[in-house]
Amino acid sequence: LIRYMDVSETLANRIQNNLNDFFNYKQFCELLKTRELTQTRINRALLHIMLGLKKNNVREYMENGGHFYAKLLGFRKDRQDLLSIIAKKSALPLLTRLSDTDSISEIGQKMLRHDILASNLYQSVITDKYKTAFRNEYKQPMLKI
């Protein structure tokens, strides 16, 4: 467990020692919490475990520049002309569709997979909380206003 981001040896031991002693996420976090291990740190570490985000992944990302693409979430229709300018002048590949990943390095594609997994996890929480349909990141339309 200590290979994951934000998981110290102390937290890893507490996780392993309390794996069978809880009924839900909130109760598990309460079992893990100490004066030194805050709720926020525990949440962040457990999220990194769920996402499979390891320290060596982040080290690899940072050693290779940290940023590998810019994902366009939406734009104003009256400013659509700026998209081609941004795409031409940007040092990073501009993603308008997730299927257009050929221009991204292998490391960048790994980072994108982590981003998509995080987005899908977020969507599953939203789906459950608000009883809405799940919106897969690959099928998410670009916002045009």
Label the model's feature ranges.
Residues L1-I145:
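Non-catalytic terminal extensions that flank enzyme cores
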